[in-house]
Amino acid sequence: RSFFGFCLLAAVLVMWQHRPSTTSKRMNKLAVFGLIAVALFALYSVGTTLLVQGYLGQANQQRTVQQIEDSGSLLIGGRPEWAGTLALMREQPMGFGLGTVPTSQDVWAAKAGMRAIGTDTENGYVDNYMFGGHFKLHSIIADMWATFGIVGFALGLIMLFALVYSLIEQLSNRTATGLVCLFAALGVWDLAFGPIYKNLPDVMFALAVTLTASAFGTATTESPTDSVEVPAVGGSARA
């Protein structure tokens, strides 16, 4: 469901930056950020409506309706692990450390946070996947916090900022390609909601694509445009 939304978002951003314009000046970065926020909200609203109405399949419809009924929001209901993560952050702000095995108190605190948003925590997912001898919080940033504490959390936020800023920079210059828009959006999603063991390589690839494209675009836009006069072969030199 989310991948369809990211493809649609990338298409909207590409079409927007190729709109006719009467000026060649770059757009303000804050305005571009506002545009992305509005586009995300619009796509989320439209996507939720399509899912609830069953236009994207009956199975997706049933799951979406159930998640909204349980938590009141598709995003919160679809990824309830953050509710458990926030509960753990309140109990242990500095994280847990590499190789730490969750205690029964840790599991109870996470379950309490997830139950607060209407999530069923007695289906084996929390006990076996999330806390079965390890911390798997289904978020790269959250997993980095649990494993490496504040330093890991800060590194995750830096990667998130790099992706967002690089995308905004290229959109303001009208140099963002469809792949850059797609990979940047996927990278941000994986940092927030993707398991670290599966999606960290995807985030590294997204960073490589977006930062390389941003550096190349900056070098192109800042290169001198004045042509150098080359004397014709055989021509006389001018004083």
Regions found by a protein language model. Give the residues of each.
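Long extracytoplasmic/lumenal interhelical loops at the membrane interface
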Residues: 69-76, 80, 94-148, 167
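Flexible juxtamembrane loops connecting transmembrane helices in multi-pass membrane enzymes
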Residues: 25-33, 41-90, 99-103, 107
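Lipid-exposed faces of alpha-helical membrane segments in multi-pass integral membrane proteins
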Residues: 5-13, 36, 40, 151-161, ...
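Hydrophobic alpha-helical segments of polytopic membrane proteins
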Residues: 1-54, 172
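Loop-to-helix entry and N-terminal half of a specific, functionally important transmembrane alpha helix
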Residues: 131-139, 143-147, 155-193
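Cytoplasmic membrane-interface segments at the C-terminal ends of transmembrane helices
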Residues: 11-28, 163-175, 215-227
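C-terminal/domain-terminus segments
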Residues: 56, 61-77, 96-103, 153, ...
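Transmembrane alpha-helices of multi-pass inner-membrane enzymes
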Residues: 11-14, 178-191, 195-234, 239
